[in-house]
């Protein structure tokens, strides 16, 4: 049995979107006959799991100071430890440039193929010494290192187009296991008297999610309630300023465990995904889009990344653009009857394109 070693800043088993991404890929590789193991990062080694879904998990400590951070981005883990696993393939998840090149050099000397799973184009703000180092690293990674890899797993069409002419590149959006009961896909699809919207996320660096825009629009629709998961009102006001006066239909629920957040999405009528058309958003692909579809919950979204390949206005959600503002979408929703909304939920349920099993043929282009 051939071995795959997955390296990167993921926190197993489901503490971040990175962990969910690599786990779905690992499940597919396992079904293809590969033995997969992980070396991720952790901020809490005492509670880090040694095994997730049957896959062995090891960790490096998340850096706490400048010295540790420099080692993290230039080495991550020793090449001796990598070779001790005797892998046939090493997959690097959003890996720093210098560490990538070191691993690539040693791996090629030992007949190991190196694949890069790339899910974002990071942005480093400011001009502090650390920010300058990050800018250099990001530039090297995206414009040089990626093209040297034996293969690239690109999360978005934007990244796929960047590297398809330079290496063996496959397009794999965020994927999930549709048989997992957390999606609760066999429940009765219903809608209540008050339309339930949900924002589930952390806003992100650079405020990639425009939660303030959503709140400004929803405040004038008392028959719509917005539930915010991932931050509390205090955190929101630190980022965006005070809540609008008289806004009574927004409820902040703070951070929740992943499974509880997924249940909240299942219990909602629409999920909100409003983002700018920035380089970062074009290069990535929102995991919450995939999760919402899997939960049978339609989306109200701007067309960041290539989600336009999947989102159909009025069918499985609503598109917000220059022709249809968020206010216009909310006006459409309050004019809908429950049957129409349930039909949209059913359309989401009928779509199974994000199940990881659909991408076996693509994976076989790299992993043989």
Regions flagged by a language model, labelled:
Residues 313-324, 332-338:
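Conserved acidic donor-binding segment of nucleotide-sugar-dependent glycosyltransferases
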Residues 17, 324, 339-367:
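A charged, aromatic-enriched C-terminal amphipathic alpha-helix characteristic of glycosyltransferases
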Residues 24-27, 73, 77-80, 98-100, ...:
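Membrane-proximal helix-turn-helix segments that form the acceptor-binding/catalytic region
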Residues 21-24, 178, 183, 193-241, ...:
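Conserved catalytic-core segment of nucleotide-activated headgroup transferases in glycan assembly
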Residues 40, 58, 142-184, 190-192, ...:
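Donor nucleotide-sugar binding/catalytic pocket of nucleotide-sugar-dependent glycosyltransferases
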Residues 12-13, 28-70, 81, 159-162, ...:
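N-terminal strand-loop element at the rim of the active site
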Residues 269, 296-297:
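A short alpha->beta transition loop at the rim of the catalytic pocket in nucleotide-sugar-dependent
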Residues 17, 205-209, 259-264, 271-291, ...:
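Nucleotide-sugar-dependent
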């Amino acid at each position: 049995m051939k071995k795959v070693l997955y390296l990167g800043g993921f926190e197993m088993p489901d503490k971040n979107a990175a962990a969910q991404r690599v786990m779905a890929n690992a499940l597919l590789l396992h079904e293809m006959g590969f033995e997969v193991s992980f070396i991720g990062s952790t901020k809490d080694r005492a509670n880090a799991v040694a095994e997730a879904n049957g896959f062995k998990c090891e960790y490096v400590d998340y850096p706490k100071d400048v010295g540790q951070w420099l080692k993290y981005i230039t080495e991550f883990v020793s090449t001796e430890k990598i070779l001790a696993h005797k892998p046939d393939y090493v997959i690097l998840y959003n890996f720093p440039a210098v560490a990538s090149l070191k691993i690539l050099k040693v791996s090629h000397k030992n007949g190991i193929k190196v694949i890069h799973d790339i899910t974002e184009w990071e942005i480093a703000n400011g001009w502090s010494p650390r920010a300058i180092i990050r800018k250099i690293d990001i530039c090297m990674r995206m414009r040089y290192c990626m093209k040297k890899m034996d293969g690239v797993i690109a999360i978005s069409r934007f990244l796929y187009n960047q590297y398809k002419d330079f290496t063996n590149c496959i397009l794999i959006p965020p994927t999930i296991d549709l048989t997992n009961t957390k999606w609760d896909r066999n429940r009765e699809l219903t809608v209540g008297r008050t339309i339930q919207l949900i924002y589930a996320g952390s806003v992100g660096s650079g405020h990639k999610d425009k939660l303030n825009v959503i709140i400004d629009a929803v405040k004038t629709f008392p028959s719509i309630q917005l539930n915010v998961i991932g931050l509390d009102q205090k955190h929101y006001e630190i980022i965006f300023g005070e809540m609008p006066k008289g806004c009574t239909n927004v409820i902040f629920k703070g951070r929740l465990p992943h499974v509880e957040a997924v249940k909240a999405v299942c219990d909602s009528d629409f999920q909100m995904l409003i983002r700018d058309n920035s380089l970062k958003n074009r290069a990535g692909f929102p995991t919450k889009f995939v999760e919402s579809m899997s939960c049978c919950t339609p989306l109200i979204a701007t067309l960041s990344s290539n989600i336009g390949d999947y989102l159909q206005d009025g069918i499985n959600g609503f598109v917000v653009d220059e022709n249809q503002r968020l206010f216009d979408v909310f006006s459409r929703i309050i004019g809908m009857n429950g049957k129409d909304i349930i039909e949209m939920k059913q359309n989401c349920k009928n779509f199974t394109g994000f199940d990881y099993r659909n991408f076996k043929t693509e994976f076989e282009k790299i992993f043989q």
